[in-house]
Amino acid sequence: MDETYEENEKVLVHHQNRIYEAKIIKVDPKTSKSDKKKPLYFIHYLGWKEKWNEWIEPNKILKYTDKNRELQKRTNIKASTTSLNNKKNTKKAKEVKQQQQQQQPIAYDSENSDEDENESELEDGGGEDADEGGEDIEDQENNNNNDTGGEEADDNNTSPRSTGSSSSSSSSKSNNNNNNNNNNNNNNNNNNNNNNNNNNKRKRNDSKSSHFQSTKFIDIEIPLSLKNKLVDDWNSINNEKSILSLPKSPNVKDILNKIIEENDKSSECKEVINGIKQYFNKALGTLLLYKFERPQYDSILKTNPKKSMSDIYGAEHLLRLFVKLPQLLVISNLEEKTITQLKDAFEIVLEYLEKNSSTLFLKEYTIASSPYLKAASSN
């Protein structure tokens, strides 16, 4: 017998190959497609935008229990592993394709570059102009031969009229020769410019290709339990219209200092963790806040203008930073050793957050007041 669910009940929902946390918004007693006795449920996926709200049948819903959360964890890990393998295969295929393209750069350009298609059209146009110039030269040579004969005949008849005609004709032909020579020179210059443009564009393409290959991205794997904390945090702020009680204790600075103290790691690791603190201070106001939190942040800036954000905010916002880091960290020309040090430091922080989540992620939220709601809606 299928479970029944009530409005506002927190549940787990099968969606594609994963299981997500959701909330029952409405219960429709009308019949479903598969069984006339089963109701439909209108659900909201926690952490998702409202456009993803949908009516689903009860066979896709699970009660929010510890047993089902374990099932969610196993299912999502399996899905993530499958997705990661697919990405690796896709990446490998792209690398093979890039190697083939490097071996045959001209063939690659002609098949895949819109710029090169335009360039080939320019080159064809230049060829047509050159042919037209050739026809003019042949006509000139024929005219010159005829003119030479006329001038020789005029030498025998020293008539002023014929001499004037010959001189005028000779002057006209000379001007035509000069004009055609200028046209040919212009065409040659255009062809040279086109060739230079082609070479420059190919150099830029080669530069882009080498830059792409030298670019390294750092992948950060956030544990599922911490992802659930992110979802709960999002739901409290955006659905329940609550704000975190600040300042937090422990704050971000306390957390990072404690990690350094407990791990007693190398100076390089300490440097990275201290760098995380500095990055947090700079990124919080622009990257880590939900719109609903903006009035609270503005108030903090007014009342504590000299305080660092790492002295005020806590684990919730530090965790948000790690969600953003893969998008922000594009590392070029770094040794593998340096990249490994970065990843090791990030993993240490995430492990600490997961291990101490029961004391760091306390649900210390306050329902927003009416003036605050008004200020948030006007932002």
Swiss-Prot record:
It holds the Pfam family MRG. This is NuA4 complex subunit EAF3 homolog. Keywords: Chromatin regulator, DNA damage, DNA repair, Growth regulation, Nucleus, Transcription, Transcription regulation. It is found in: Nucleus. GO terms for biological process: chromatin organization; DNA repair; regulation of DNA-templated transcription. Its main location: nucleus. Residues 111-141 have a biased composition (Acidic residues). Disulfide bonds: none annotated. The keyword Nucleus applies. InterPro entries: Chromo-like_dom_sf, MRG, MRG_C_sf, MRG_dom, MSL3_chromo-like. PANTHER family: MORTALITY FACTOR 4-LIKE PROTEIN, MSL COMPLEX SUBUNIT 3. Residues 75-212 are annotated as: Disordered. Component of the NuA4 histone acetyltransferase complex. Component of the NuA4 histone acetyltransferase complex which is involved in transcriptional activation of selected genes principally by acetylation of nucleosomal histone H4 and H2A. The NuA4 complex is also involved in DNA repair. Also a component of a complex which acts to repress transcription by deacetylation of nucleosomal histones. The keyword Transcription regulation applies. Residues 78-87, 165-199 have a biased composition (Low complexity). Residues 214-377 form the MRG domain. One of its GO terms (cellular component) is nucleus. Residues 6-61 form the Tudor-knot domain.
